[in-house]
Amino acid sequence: MEAFTTHTGRAVPLRRSNVDTDQIIPAHWLKKVTRDGFEDGLFEAWRKDESFILNRPERTGATVLVAGPDFGTGSSREHAVWALQNYGFKAVISSRFADIFRGNSLKNGLLTVVLEQKIVDALWELTEKDPQAEVTVDLEAREVRAEGITAAFELDENARWRLLNGLDDISITLQNEGDIATYEAKRPSHKPRTLQV
């Protein structure tokens, strides 16, 4: 997983609330188990509308999604996180996220930032007025900055540490590989064990 410290990029203002994971990535995309190749499925139904925000040329290459409240509701699917990442998003800002979606995001390296709705509104206004406006998401300082906007955000220490160091569940486990091997070597052969393939 790539470490996240500070990211600056252009934003997409997604003025929609209660965006569920099926809207983020429809169920027929869930047949794959790899983490790549989901960018075309991101908001697939909405992207059929030529006027949808992601279809606008000035939004190409944007890396920060500024979404409405209750983003990521619905069923738990890591594919929704992967689709956002595959498309190029590094952070999603909203006034409220579904808990499971937020947990999946943070475990997969996608920073979800909770800000007051009035700050989200200000970011929408700024990025609608100027599609080239940049938004900085600073995890070290726990701050979002844009022209005329500075807003602090909270994130639990464990999630912050994992993101700052680029650690997912597997890489954290692998930090203890030596101790695990020592334990397994001492374990009686008649008991279940992990085998190296």
UniProtKB/Swiss-Prot annotation:
The keyword Transmembrane does not apply. The gene is leuD. Gene3D superfamilies: Aconitase, domain 4. GO terms for molecular function: 3-isopropylmalate dehydratase activity. Its EC number is 4.2.1.33. The keyword Transcription does not apply. Keywords: Amino-acid biosynthesis, Branched-chain amino acid biosynthesis, Leucine biosynthesis, Lyase. One of its GO terms (cellular component) is 3-isopropylmalate dehydratase complex. It catalyses: (2R,3S)-3-isopropylmalate = (2S)-2-isopropylmalate. Pathway: Amino-acid biosynthesis; L-leucine biosynthesis; L-leucine from 3-methyl-2-oxobutanoate: step 2/4. One of its GO terms (biological process) is L-leucine biosynthetic process. Catalyzes the isomerization between 2-isopropylmalate and 3-isopropylmalate, via the formation of 2-isopropylmaleate. It comes from the Bacteria. Heterodimer of LeuC and LeuD. Belongs to the LeuD family. LeuD type 1 subfamily. This is 3-isopropylmalate dehydratase small subunit. It holds the Pfam family Aconitase_C. It comes from Streptomyces avermitilis (strain ATCC 31267 / DSM 46492 / JCM 5070 / NBRC 14893 / NCIMB 12804 / NRRL 8165 / MA-4680).
